[in-house]
């Protein structure tokens, strides 16, 4: 028995009957030999973590566009927080932590530069709405590894797709990633908003703070612990109704006070205009696309490929390409 086989056996011994077992995966789009050391979900997490798309999350906006300060969240720090929350909940419920971690690592790979401003920009240019969860699945299925994709397991792929939107993953681990994403972004966006001077702790509605807590750590702790304890008590995945309602109310509060605040969105129109102009440029000049994108034109069409290229940009790379293409360079006398 090798290391992987021993770990798969231990999953049957220690995990809940409701947990997704690595040995029972529905498999990958292209069959592969098993690894001697890592389970299939561990391999998926490693593939995502070592991908170029994951590294680019470091330079993609979470909420605040181009903030002045080193402590604001990026897509990467958000992703890491989601993964930790998901693992904690899965550990408490004896579910598969490796599956949840892999889906969490991949859930935002398809996000555009400049956050949801970029998503809106591409939606205005494409023939159908741009949805980052669908793009995240496209990244791992088709765009990574120069078009070969990462060949991830079905359960991780559906966890990525179902972290937002109407589709609900069939595994409990995938559903936990969905909840962990919301727990993470609501709470760390409050923290960033306080850092930006948009909010103070006293601004949080009293009835919400009374239930969830009066600090960043208290709120996350309340939500995570309640998710675990209520699920164990009821046998159904979820928080107590009053706690779930308080989280929804906090999210509504954030939309009213932060997500539409001029400080957070002050540069959004500029970001949209920049990406739309880049999109138009590459539609007219496809030969200027990177060479590795060109072979896909015959299969996916110009609009889709240009959208892939722009969605994959980091904030600073989009600014660089815009400056390179549209801003006159300074003459240098030699």
Where are the regions that the model predicts?
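Histidine-centered, transition-metal-coordinating active-site segments
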Residues: 1-75, 79, 83-89, 96-97, ...
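Aspartate-rich (DDxxD/NDxxD/DxxxD) Mg2+/diphosphate-binding motifs
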Residues: 99-125
């Amino acid at each position: 028995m090798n290391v992987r086989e021993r770990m798969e056996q231990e999953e049957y011994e220690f995990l809940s009957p409701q947990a997704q077992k690595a040995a029972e995966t529905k498999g990958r789009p292209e069959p592969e030999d098993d690894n001697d050391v890592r389970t299939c979900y561990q391999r998926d997490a490693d593939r995502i973590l070592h991908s170029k798309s994951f590294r680019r999350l470091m330079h993609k906006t979470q909420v605040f566009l181009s903030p002045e300060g080193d402590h604001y969240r990026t897509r990467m720090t958000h992703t890491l927080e989601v993964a930790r929350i998901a693992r904690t909940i899965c550990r408490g419920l004896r579910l598969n932590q490796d599956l949840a971690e892999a889906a969490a690592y991949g859930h935002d790979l398809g996000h555009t530069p400049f956050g949801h401003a970029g998503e809106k920009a591409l939606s205005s240019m494409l023939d159908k709405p741009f949805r980052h969860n669908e793009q995240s699945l496209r990244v791992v299925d088709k765009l990574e590894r120069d078009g070969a994709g990462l060949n991830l397991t079905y359960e991780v792929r559906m966890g990525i797709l179902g972290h937002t939107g109407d589709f609900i993953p069939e595994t409990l681990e995938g559903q936990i990633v969905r909840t962990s994403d919301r727990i993470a972004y609501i709470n760390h966006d409050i923290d960033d908003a306080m850092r930006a001077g948009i909010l103070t702790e006293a601004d949080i509605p009293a009835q919400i703070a009374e239930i969830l807590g009066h600090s960043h750590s208290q709120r996350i702790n309340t939500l995570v612990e309640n998710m675990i304890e209520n699920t164990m008590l009821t046998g159904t995945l979820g928080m107590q109704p009053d706690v779930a309602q308080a989280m929804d109310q906090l999210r509504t509060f954030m939309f009213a006070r932060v997500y539409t605040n001029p400080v957070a969105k002050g540069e959004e129109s500029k970001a949209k205009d920049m990406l739309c102009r880049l999109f138009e440029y590459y539609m007219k000049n496809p030969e200027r696309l990177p060479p590795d994108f060109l072979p896909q034109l015959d299969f996916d069409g110009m609009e889709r490929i240009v959208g892939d290229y722009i969605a994959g940009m980091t904030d600073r790379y989009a600014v660089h390409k815009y400056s390179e293409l549209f801003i006159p360079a300074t003459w240098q006398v030699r």
